[in-house]
Design a protein with these regions (language model features):
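Nucleic-acid endonuclease domains
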Residues: 1-82, 95, 101-202
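Active-site beta-strand-loop-beta-strand hairpin of nuclease catalytic cores
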Residues: 87-98
Length: 202
């Protein structure tokens, strides 16, 4: 597909967020989830065991370091129903970001990205809403977390290869994938066509 202004804008937004997070790496600490005496045998190395906590470290450090990162503001107090985890404002423009975590010790599998209905409704209600996913890699051993500075995947759901898991009606994709550049209209139609949700049917 040709590079329309819409597609160029989304790619530019992804580039801005990538630059911000690349700069954030210098501030992201390695840390222990808790004290050794509390969990003397550590945690099982499942991403779900620590993903929310690691996401909080990333979003809170982004806000705490906003001046050094050249940001106007960072908001992360979002309701649980919200598609994005944080709103990053730079030069007066707000970016909507959902932070994901990948365990570098595990395999690259397809992941549930988002419920189709939530994504469809948000993109329908707000034509200016562009969600950006930012996936950070971590090394997780015992109770210690280390960030992998050479791993970062940023993508727009609009450019995902569309596969909807029929069991839960969620888009599934690899964090690392080749983007499929498409218009918002095409994206919405693909969501509608592939969804099993009655709400989305014409």
């Amino acid at each position: 597909m040709s590079m329309t202004p819409e597609i160029k804008n989304i790619l530019a937004e992804i580039g801005v967020i990538q630059s911000i997070y690349q700069n954030l790496f210098q501030f992201l600490p390695s840390f222990k989830v808790t004290d050794d005496s509390i969990l003397p045998y550590g945690l099982k190395p499942h991403t779900r065991s620590v993903s929310w906590l690691v996401e909080q470290v990333i979003t809170q450090q982004t806000k705490f370091r906003k001046k050094a990162l050249g940001l106007d503001d960072v908001a992360f107090d979002m309701p649980d129903t919200c598609l994005h985890d944080c709103e990053i404002t730079k030069n007066g423009k707000t970016y909507f970001v959902n932070v994901k975590i990948h365990n570098m010790g595990g395999r690259e599998n397809k992941n549930d990205i988002s419920a189709v209905e939530k994504l469809y409704m948000q993109y329908s209600a707000n034509p200016d809403y562009n969600l950006i996913y930012a996936c950070f890699g971590i090394h997780f051993k015992g109770i210690e977390i280390h960030f992998e500075t050479d791993y970062m995947q940023l993508f727009s759901p609009q450019f995902l290869p569309i596969y909807v898991n029929p069991r839960n009606d969620k888009i599934q994709a690899f964090y690392h994938h080749d983007p499929v550049l498409r218009s918002r209209k095409e994206f919405m139609e693909l969501l509608r066509t592939n969804s099993k949700s009655i709400v989305l049917k014409k």
